[in-house]
Amino acid sequence: MPSIVLPPKPTALQKPHINLAVVGHVDNGKSTLVGRLLYETGYVDEKAFKEIEEMAKKMGKEDFAFAWILDRFKEERERGVTIEATHVGFETQKLFITIIDLPGHRDFVKNMIVGASQADAALFVISARPGEFETAIGPQGQGREHLFLIRTLGIQQLVVAVNKMDAVNYDQKRYEQVKAEVSKLLKLLGYDPSKIHFVPVSAIKGDNVRTKSPNTPWYQGPTLLEVLDTFQPPPRPTDKPLRMPIQDVFSITGAGTVVVGRVETGVLKVGDKVVIVPPAKVGDVRSIETHHMKLEQAQPGDNVGVNVRGINKEDVKRGDVLGKVDNIPTVAEEIVARIVVLWHPTAIGPGYAPVMHIHTATVPVQIVELVSKLDPRTGQAVEQKPQFIKQGDVAIVKIKPLKPVVAEKFSDFPPLGRFALRDMGRTIAAGQILEVKPAQVQIK
């Protein structure tokens, strides 16, 4: 049985690569739109999709067929049918676009902040249907939360898909109303709405996704795929020291220890002498693989499996970081960070102990000091040593990890310098590290 989502075609691997986050409130059509994009770009197995369509028809749920592409893919992944295909992707004329952390995941907010694949751009999906739209950008709406989040992450490239236009009879007035409301929110967050494309689409019917729709003669702009095609791939920092957070560790018979992760900065070559910290274990790189292809070297953005000689599986875990012996990743004794409080029922003071999610690591921490409270618009300090901070506040804080963890300054290594704080099953804050006080590391 072929996988429902096809692997990258040879043409795709020659194109510049972008990681796209698909964000928006539940039930606004994210999964359907992703399914539609994959289908329109030829990345869905026809035979497998026909089965899904027939099943949806039988159950009287024809509208679900495109969303079910992702459900089927997730099932395959959980059953281990497609181990390396944790991401799905599609091609535009100029780019190969990977969709990171498929929508609907319960840890989506956390994964957005510290996902192994950091987003270079975002597709914001908002429903035009009355009620759904108002909920999504209301005070408790995930749509609103996700927009705050992509702003906090510094994602500049954004497209807004105003979805479910078929449900409002392709009404231009409703589209303009949604556009005006979302623009207001974007402006508040410091985006320039005039530079952001809004596209009226129907994920179910396919309007304005790949081809211009006759149902929206009033819309003269580009299709969704045309907008995505204008996104710029970020510079990949090959000149920085090597940092590769570890997502997984395997012991493979006859090969030894294989660590899996994404190279965030620097270059990893076969034969390199590497160190994995916090455990401070040293080894040699025997081979590097991606998508079942052997590589001589891996660069930023590459998701790879690395066969390391001299390190045992028991010594390494998810959340450790691989670097080179001549530039060891920093294990943090204490960090100073700027945080945005996204959600908290009361207030946060010194002594508060949430869990920090940083790159692929999860570690208990304690906020030991509130240094200052900032004006969110200017970044200037408005209060020194506040007694507490609450939802919506931006502050500089000192944080002490209660277990060893690698953390770097955001300005040096962005993917290892941004984090989420979680508590009570929710994301409490998103932050960027300004200073790191390093712990002593003895190489073994």
Swiss-Prot record:
GTP hydrolase that promotes the GTP-dependent binding of aminoacyl-tRNA to the A-site of ribosomes during protein biosynthesis. It is an enzyme of class 3 (hydrolase). Residues 101-104 are annotated as: G3. The gene is tuf. Its main location: cytoplasm. Residues 24-31 are annotated as: G1. The keyword Hydrolase applies. Keywords: Cytoplasm, Elongation factor, GTP-binding, Hydrolase, Magnesium, Metal-binding, Nucleotide-binding, Protein biosynthesis. PANTHER family: TRANSLATION FACTOR (PTHR23115). GTP binds at residues 24-31, 101-105, 163-166. It is found in: Cytoplasm. Transmembrane segments: none annotated. It comes from Pyrobaculum calidifontis (strain DSM 21063 / JCM 11548 / VA1). Belongs to the TRAFAC class translation factor GTPase superfamily. Classic translation factor GTPase family. EF-Tu/EF-1A subfamily. InterPro entries: EFTu-like_2, EFTU-type, G_TR_CS, GTP-eEF1A_C, P-loop_NTPase, T_Tr_GTP-bd_dom, TRAFAC_GTPase_members, Transl_B-barrel_sf. Its EC number is 3.6.5.3. Residues 15-236 form the tr-type G domain. Residues 80-84 are annotated as: G2. Residues 202-204 are annotated as: G5. Pfam families: GTP-eEF1A_C (PF22594), GTP_EFTU (PF00009), GTP_EFTU_D2 (PF03144), GTP_EFTU_D4 (PF14578). The keyword Metal-binding applies. This is Elongation factor 1-alpha. GO terms for molecular function: GTP binding; GTPase activity; translation elongation factor activity. PROSITE patterns: G_TR_1 (PS00301), G_TR_2 (PS51722). GO terms for cellular component: cytoplasm. CDD domains: EF1_alpha, EF1_alpha_II, EF1_alpha_III.
